[in-house]
Curated annotation (Swiss-Prot):
It comes from Helicobacter pylori (strain Shi470). Gene3D superfamilies: 3.40.1350.10. Belongs to the UPF0102 family. GO terms for molecular function: nucleic acid binding. This is UPF0102 protein HPSH_02690.
Length: 114
């Protein structure tokens, strides 16, 4: 696991906080934030219309943050989701989403795959 410096981590936390507020305006209910497993972390777990959304938040100003979500990152997310379901209701419908924050604008990409 890569350790982030305090400035980088603070920017990430701010982006996640803003992302939660944005998601609430779209009708999402926050279930959990920063769920950790030995495989990785899920930034936001939210519920909308009975579907759990596992959301990776990526932010950036000088590059397109979507490129930070690689096939390797998605595989780690899937393993982490399996860990989540081993502790919670394994019968929930779910999808993996990305929330891109760039220059103060938000873009939700639902049901991403590789």
């Amino acid at each position: 696991m890569r350790f982030l410096n305090n400035k980088h981590r603070a920017k990430g936390l701010k982006a996640e906080e803003e992302a939660c507020e944005f998601l609430k305006t779209l009708g999402f209910e926050m279930v959990e934030r920063n769920f950790f497993s030995k495989f990785g972390e899920i930034d936001i777990i939210a519920l909308k219309k009975g579907v759990l959304h596992f959301i990776e938040v990526k932010s950036g100003e000088n590059f397109d943050p979507i490129y930070a979500i690689t096939p390797s990152k998605l595989k780690k997310m899937i393993k982490t989701i399996r860990c989540y379901f081993s502790q919670k209701d394994p019968n929930s419908d779910f999808c993996i989403d990305a929330l891109i924050v760039k220059n103060g604008k938000f873009e939700l990409l639902e049901n991403i795959t590789f």
